[in-house]
Amino acid sequence: MERGNRKSRIGVVVSNKMTKTVVVKVERRVADPKYGKIVTKAEKYKAHDEDQACQIGDRVRIVETRPISKDKRWRVAETIEKAEA
């Protein structure tokens, strides 16, 4: 049973050294408030990867979930594109 709309993000896996956890870098393009120049801003999210299937460079979709640990509030929903080996 789904409760409301959950936030989702698409990003690239930058680290998978932790057990059942990956770090996903999500980039977004925003206009600078003063000058209007388009700049790229990035955020990193720790996400739960139950199957430990993600590799560095994979493009994944993460969705919001209940807090799993101090830093983890996201989980990997699907792998959109696998990294080239």
From Swiss-Prot:
Keywords: Ribonucleoprotein, Ribosomal protein, RNA-binding, rRNA-binding. Coiled coil: none annotated. GO terms for cellular component: cytosolic small ribosomal subunit. The keyword Transport does not apply. It holds the Pfam family Ribosomal_S17. One of its GO terms (biological process) is translation. One of its GO terms (molecular function) is structural constituent of ribosome. InterPro entries: NA-bd_OB-fold, Ribosomal_uS17, Ribosomal_uS17_bact/chlr, Ribosomal_uS17_CS. The keyword RNA-binding applies. Gene3D superfamilies: Nucleic acid-binding proteins. Part of the 30S ribosomal subunit. One of the primary rRNA binding proteins, it binds specifically to the 5'-end of 16S ribosomal RNA. HAMAP family: Ribosomal_uS17_B. Belongs to the universal ribosomal protein uS17 family. This is Small ribosomal subunit protein uS17. It comes from Anaeromyxobacter dehalogenans (strain 2CP-C). The gene is rpsQ.
